Amino acid sequence: MAVKQSAIEDLRAAPDRKKISVIVTTFNEEANVAECLESVLWADEIVLVDSFSTDRTVAIAHTFPITVLQRQYFGSAAQKNWALDRVQHEWVLIIDADERVPEALAREVLTLLATDPAINGFYIRRE
């Protein structure tokens, strides 16, 4: 389920909107990575950190307008913390390749980043 870029272009173009990076962590996720990345194309930056997959994960990731990095796996927290030092924006959403960001959530995040200067974080319940 790809988030339609045209549906959220106005939110992305909002002046003074805080920008957001998305971090996606992967290892042998060729079955999931394309759908995951399609669901976050609304973000200002996407960084995928792969743990040297032996399947087509990295090749698929390279077909998207994202940054692909590889790093030996030292645990989930270590991968995500390492990736945090490599993104450009203060706002960061971290997801695994088997997760998706529904369009409604993308709109809500972008709306709040564009309209609520007091917001300082999100809690997103996993379903």
Map each language-model feature to its residues:
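Active-site acidic Asp-centered loop
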Residues: 51, 95-97, 104
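Glycine-rich, basic loop-to-helix element that forms the pyrophosphate-binding segment
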Residues: 72-87
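Cell-envelope/extracellular polymer assembly enzymes that use nucleotide-activated donors
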Residues: 19-21
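Conserved donor NDP-sugar-binding/catalytic core segment of glycosyltransferases
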Residues: 76, 100-127
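Acidic helix N-cap motif at the loop->helix transition within catalytic regions
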Residues: 34, 55-64, 104-105
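Short, well-formed alpha-helical segments that are part of the catalytic scaffolds
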Residues: 24-42
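Short aromatic/hydrophobic "clamp" motif used to bind/position activated sugar donors
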Residues: 92
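A conserved acidic beta->alpha catalytic loop
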Residues: 39, 50-59
